[in-house]
């Protein structure tokens, strides 16, 4: 099966066995560039494999084309959601296919940048950060992805104010790892108090990780806080 990356509605992954191309990519990555996605089963569920694959894809994509990814993430949310397919290339996929929402791809890229930022001296970080705006909500007739993204960031802001370490633990620990599972066990009971009114879509772990990654990276500069004199 040739490598394919598909932007679609459902997050999932199917990877074929490794062949000559994967061995070549593995050897080359030790010298020149981050490895492409190649996941063994390791006892993961299909849902866990999907999250692991998305995190690995984001790591590879930013590692190989950091300037391009950074420029993409600086665009207004509506514009970046609309052109995500420009980053969806198979250079970071050994074999098989990855299927995920455009907003999830965007969020995992933000999460990867946040992880790297945490390990980099501030004076050496050269990628701009576009601050959050949690006051100016999208219009009622705005595209659904934009409205959903705003609701997720608002939810994350609520959770972060209640327990910032917990939000960071979800993003900084590897998907499906023991530490991340522990973070989720603590997080789940807190979710209901922070879910915005009218939010009627599935809140999967991949959606949560995407929102948390974007929130944390864009909060590295002062965010415009919720409730600054604007009625909803």
Predicted segments — roles?
Residues 7-19:
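Hydrophobic h-region of N-terminal signal peptides that target proteins for export
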Residues 19-117:
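N-terminal Sec/ER secretory leader and immediately downstream segment
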Residues 107-175:
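Extended amphipathic alpha-helical interaction segments
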Residues 26-28, 32, 50, 54, ...:
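Eukaryotic terminal intrinsically disordered regions
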Residues 181-232:
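A cross-kingdom marker for long, charged
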Residues 49-55, 62, 146-155, 160, ...:
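Short, low-complexity cationic-aromatic patches
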Residues 63-88, 162-196:
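Extended intrinsically disordered, low-complexity coil regions enriched in Ser, Thr, Gly, Ala
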Residues 1-7:
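Bacterial N-terminal signal peptides that target proteins for export
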């Amino acid at each position: 099966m040739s490598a394919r990356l598909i932007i679609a509605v459902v997050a999932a992954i199917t990877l074929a066995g490794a062949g000559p191309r994967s061995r070549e990519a593995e050897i080359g990555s030790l010298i020149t560039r981050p490895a492409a996605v190649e996941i063994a089963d390791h006892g993961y569920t299909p849902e866990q494999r999907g999250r692991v694959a998305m995190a690995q894809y984001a790591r590879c994509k930013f590692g190989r084309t950091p300037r391009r990814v950074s420029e993409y993430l600086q665009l207004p949310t509506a514009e970046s959601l609309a052109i995500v397919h420009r980053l969806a290339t198979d250079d970071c996929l050994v074999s098989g296919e990855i299927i995920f929402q455009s907003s999830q791809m965007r969020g995992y890229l933000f999460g990867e940048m946040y992880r790297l930022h945490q390990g980099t001296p501030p004076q050496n970080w050269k990628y701009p950060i576009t601050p959050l705006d949690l006051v100016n909500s999208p219009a009622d007739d705005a595209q659904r992805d934009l409205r959903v993204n705003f609701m997720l960031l608002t939810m994350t802001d609520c959770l972060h104010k209640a327990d910032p370490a917990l939000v960071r633990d979800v993003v900084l620990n590897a998907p499906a790892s023991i530490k991340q599972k522990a973070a989720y066990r603590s997080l789940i009971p807190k979710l209901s108090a922070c879910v915005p009114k009218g939010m009627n879509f599935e809140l999967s772990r991949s959606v949560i990780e995407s929102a948390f990654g974007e929130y944390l990276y864009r909060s590295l500069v002062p965010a415009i806080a919720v409730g600054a004199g604007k009625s909803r």
